[in-house]
Amino acid sequence: MSATQDAFFMARAIELAKNGLYTTDPNPRVGCVIVRDNTIIGEGWHVKAGQGHAEVEALKTLSDAIGATAYVTLEPCSHHGKTPPCCDALIVAGIKRVVVAMQDPNPLVSGRGLEKLNLAGCEVACGVLEEAASALNRGFISRMTRHRPFVRSKLAMSLDGRTAMASGESQWITSAQARADVQTLRAESSAILTGINTVLADDPFLNARVNVSVVQPIRVILDTHLATPVTAKMASLDGRSLVLTVSSDETKKSILEAVGFEVYQLPFKQGHLDLNAVMHFLAEQQINDVLVEAGAVLNGALLAEDLVDEWVVYMAPCVLGDQGRGLFNMPQLQQMADKKCFTWHDVRHVGPDLKLTLSSASIER
């Protein structure tokens, strides 16, 4: 089969994988297409952790796969987890050729699946539309290779770079369309991270309000001194709400745990939570993608540590004045050479606002 045909069928597999965009955590999003004589005869995708993987779901849709080609967006697994190995299912079904978009970064798999298929007599090809497939699973890849999640921070600002009035009033700088777009960012995320200042000021729910099936993100508060109120709205929601702290106050911890919070003590650095330790802890919790929704203090600290992989900034066509609050609280930079630089990735309209997508120039995406 030609490279053009391989790319065509892999593109379809990638579209199928997107069906799991909001539901597969902590697993990767994977799609599979089975082809015989240049015709798609079976399709499937991974829906949810613990349920069938994409290859198995595709095989379920047909009675005979002998001699066919399977296009899979991620290397088929070769180990026993919550489900049996997908490699075995493909081999038993009589698949003759397996085309994979990318090798699995999971060290339990990482090349072993391709090797097993090869040894069983399957023709194997890897790297077809790899970049597009990787983009679907940035968080999973980050957790497996960097031992921390892919971190995205959402910011909303005026034309003059202000996030709130001097009083702290911020509802609403951006439009209803921009705020609705944020809900999709939440739905795509494994966790939403905020700081105690935002909790005390806004008391947010930090849930994803979308009209599709979604695994609700884990809510995470960075709270150095355990100041989170027991009345915080997010404690009333289903799912996990975590408070990460440096405090060893067992009384405060017990009070928060009694209303539904999980409280974890982490290392500190210069009197505050060690943000690198936070990211490693979140990876240990099987969190792939983190969305930061916080104020200038936490965003400034994350920027200073180069811990944000992607910045999503909604800019409204309004001006709040020079007394308004800024995007980042950071130590004063002494010279132009110390400036923080970014790389543009996308600019588009969302209603009357602009949605700007950038990464820190010092971080490889």
Predicted ranges, named:
Residues 29-38, 155-156, 356:
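Short beta-strand scaffold segments in enzyme catalytic cores
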Residues 105-108, 131-132, 200, 227-229, ...:
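Short gly/pro/ser/thr-enriched loop/turn and capping motifs at secondary-structure boundaries
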Residues 34-132, 218, 249, 303:
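Zn2+-dependent cytidine deaminase-like catalytic core
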Residues 142, 148, 152-159, 163-288, ...:
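Active-site ligand-binding patch in enzyme domains
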Residues 304-342:
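Flexible, gly/pro- and Lys/Arg-enriched active-site loops
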Residues 13, 31, 77, 117, ...:
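Residue-level signal for inorganic ion chemistry
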